[in-house]
């Protein structure tokens, strides 16, 4: 099984050695702090032709594995385009991914949802596709592996994000799209592959395809244990022979195996050194995340109350109610991380649930502060959000208190702060899908509950690869069941 085609795909007859293409490539090179390798030069040449001569319905697909310099190359391309006065819009699937994109590109990136959708009206049930008023603009989307085309339970446009993104971009005069990501990462939840990184799937939109695949580890990353071991996993996936690889840790300082005996101490040291916002535990399930969150709050942070100031929380369900009065945030997204600034008053117990009034800030949205009501019951549960039974109980209990005909009561329900309370989990340990698109200085990867049969499943390797590549500086493998070249400390 091939993870990705091993050759680049360019439209028939494309030449990337003309003077204008070479001129643009030179401009990008001047924006880079290093000399590009051969693969990176191929990317520059292909992008130059895409920009200068590509069909109006052309799309560029950039797959770059961890350590291949994809992000720095795109950063250089954005700088060169800006110097030329060429308009660009940078997008990412989540607020956290947009923040990372902003940091490495030097230009503001937005979430896809914020850019391409508009709310139908206050208290409406959804968002419509907005009009693309941009002209002659290149839309560059990072972390495209996260873009789904499934319509289940979506309030946005057609519900198929990739369809809507493509329709939005190409409805603008002279606008084109660049999709970049890493096919070795986890695909969207419930999908076997990432449709936005699949050239054949994109061709079904009648688009002209430019596809470049970066595989060569950049010289600057060659000494990284994180990237060395990510490459081991990638090679296993590409080979199609899924057998447990031997990880190499001994000669690297940035990846270690840690046992439970030293885990709390090591996490605590990471908090002291880099802060809670730069340390994350990545797990395989919500149940494991709940166990780690409980242990961290009890044994490292010594927090006895269920919710206190400085608690980090993860939003577990989209919410369209609380952000209405805030220009910076259109809606609160599933996966957004918030920090508790203040807890107001006493816990309210209503409708069989516990509620708290809090002020939170959004680190991935310019530290915007917002007063919200949250549901506490999800914090310590093994489910990602309220169960179907709890949700139904909340709905029927609130509706029973409202008066008027069914339409009037439903309109009032949409205004009810209890029905619209934020559903949140603790954010010290999260699942890998929730971590995707983000980066932290220190990443602890929970491998203690992994069964041997996982080693024959592609999903396991994608999960571990995605988790390892969330780290900027240090990876700790917790009770790693894979063979390594060093003992646990």
Question: Positions of the model-derived regions?
Answer:
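Pre-P-loop entry segment of helicase/translocase ATPase cores
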Residues: 2-58
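Conserved helicase motor core of P-loop NTPases
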Residues: 18-24, 47-48, 55, 170-175, ...
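Conserved SAM-binding loop
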Residues: 36, 90, 281
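Short, conserved phosphate/pyrophosphate- and ester-handling motifs at nucleotide-, phospho-/glycolipid
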Residues: 40, 94, 285, 437
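Generic structural signal for buried aliphatic residues
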Residues: 43, 313, 338, 440-443
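ASCE P-loop NTPase helicase motor core
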Residues: 44-45, 49, 54-243, 250
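Short, solvent-exposed amphipathic alpha-helical segments in soluble enzyme
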Residues: 106, 296-300, 462-463
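C-terminal accessory regions
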Residues: 349-489
């Amino acid at each position: 099984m091939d993870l990705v085609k091993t050759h680049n795909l360019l439209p028939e007859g494309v030449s990337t050695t003309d003077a204008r293409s070479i001129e643009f490539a030179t401009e990008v090179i001047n924006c880079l702090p290093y000399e590009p390798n051969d693969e990176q030069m191929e990317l520059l040449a292909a992008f130059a032709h895409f920009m200068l001569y590509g069909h109006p319905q052309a799309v560029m697909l950039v797959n770059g594995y961890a350590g291949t310099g994809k992000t720095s190359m795109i950063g250089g391309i954005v700088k060169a385009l800006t110097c030329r006065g060429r308009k660009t819009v940078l997008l990412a699937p989540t607020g956290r991914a947009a923040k990372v994109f902003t940091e490495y590109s030097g230009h503001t990136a937005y979430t896809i949802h914020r850019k391409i959708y508009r709310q139908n009206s206050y208290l409406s049930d959804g968002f419509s596709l907005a009009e693309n008023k941009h002209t002659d603009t290149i839309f560059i989307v990072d972390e495209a592996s996260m873009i789904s085309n499934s319509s289940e339970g979506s309030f946005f446009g057609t519900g198929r994000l990739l369809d809507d993104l493509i329709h939005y971009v190409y409805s603008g005069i002279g606008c084109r799209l660049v999709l970049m990501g890493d096919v070795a990462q986890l695909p969207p939840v419930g999908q076997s592959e990432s449709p936005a990184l699949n050239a054949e799937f994109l061709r079904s939109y009648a688009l002209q395809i430019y596809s470049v695949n970066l595989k060569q580890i950049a010289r600057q990353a060659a000494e990284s244990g994180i990237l060395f071991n990510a490459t081991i996993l990638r090679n296993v996936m590409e080979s199609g022979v899924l057998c447990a690889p031997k990880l190499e840790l001994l000669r690297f300082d940035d990846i270690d195996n840690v046992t439970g005996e030293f885990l709390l101490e090591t996490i605590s040291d990471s908090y002291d050194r880099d802060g809670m916002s730069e340390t994350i535990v990545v797990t395989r399930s919500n149940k494991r995340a709940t166990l780690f969150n409980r242990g961290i709050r009890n044994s490292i942070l010594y927090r006895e109350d269920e919710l206190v100031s400085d608690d980090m929380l993860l939003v577990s369900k989209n919410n369209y109610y609380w952000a209405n009065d805030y220009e910076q945030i259109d809606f609160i997204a599933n996966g957004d991380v918030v920090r508790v600034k203040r807890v107001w008053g006493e816990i309210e117990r209503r409708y069989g649930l516990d509620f708290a009034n809090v002020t939170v800030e959004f680190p991935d949205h310019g530290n915007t502060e917002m007063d919200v009501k949250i549901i506490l019951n999800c914090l310590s549960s093994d489910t990602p959000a309220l169960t179907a039974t709890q949700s139904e109980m909340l709905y029927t209990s609130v509706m029973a208190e409202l008066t008027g005909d069914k339409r009037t009561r439903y309109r009032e329900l949409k205004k009810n702060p209890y029905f619209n309370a934020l559903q949140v989990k603790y954010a010290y340990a999260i699942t890998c899908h929730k971590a995707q698109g983000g980066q932290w200085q220190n990443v602890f990867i929970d491998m203690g509950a992994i069964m041997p049969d996982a080693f024959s499943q592609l999903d396991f390797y994608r999960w571990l690869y995605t988790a390892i590549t969330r780290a900027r500086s240090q990876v700790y493998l917790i009770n790693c069941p894979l063979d390594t070249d060093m003992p646990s400390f």
